[in-house]
Amino acid sequence: MNSEKSVIYIMFICLLAMSCSGSKGNRTILPDGLVLADGDVVFRRGSGLMSHTVVAADGGRYSHVGIVVDSAGVKMIVHAVPDEPDFPGDIDRVKMESPRKFFSTINANVGEVMRHIDKNVASVAAREAMRLYRCGLLFDHDYDDNDSTKLYCSELVERAYLRAGVSLAEKRRHDFAVPGFHFEHVIMPSDIYESSQLKTISRF
């Protein structure tokens, strides 16, 4: 691998990975009074270069996706994200955070909440997402949905719903080509978003 190809590869991976990452912020775009439900699928897009790059490559509206779960009576969002440690030495993994943080103004300038048409299916998916979070699964930097030991953001949501017997992405996948490299069968946020089983609850 020559140096030019190495640089291009590293830049591409960083752009795709960082689109699923975020920084801490005190303000949020989440509307006051919005009631979330178990299994809700939440989308966001930021204003940074990485978000725009992924949206351009994806052809969709959003660059990141997560799923709402119930944690001891409190609604939280589970999502797979790199480069956002919760403590020194933390590794890139599936994590859980508050809706306000997920939709912080540092992470997002637009967002959307979608809900599955079947409440029971959504509840099963939420429980599976919580289980995956508790397993401490690593973030999948290879974006390989054939590797069940690691997950990236869209793959996590798809896998949670598969546990309930439902595929949100169905057969929709994206291939990415950069000089010297080819990424195949990647589930992007738009592949989840286009599911006919999801209905918009709020767009902001």
Residue ranges of each PLM-predicted region?
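Glycine-rich catalytic cores of cysteine/serine-nucleophile enzymes that process amide/ester linkages
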Residues: R44-E112, L138-L151
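Bacterial Sec signal peptide processing site at the extreme N-terminus
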Residues: S21-L34
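Extracytoplasmic/secreted proteins, especially bacterial periplasmic and envelope-associated proteins
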Residues: R61, V124, E128, Y152-R159
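C-terminal motif of bacterial Sec signal peptides marking the signal peptidase cleavage site
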Residues: A17-S19
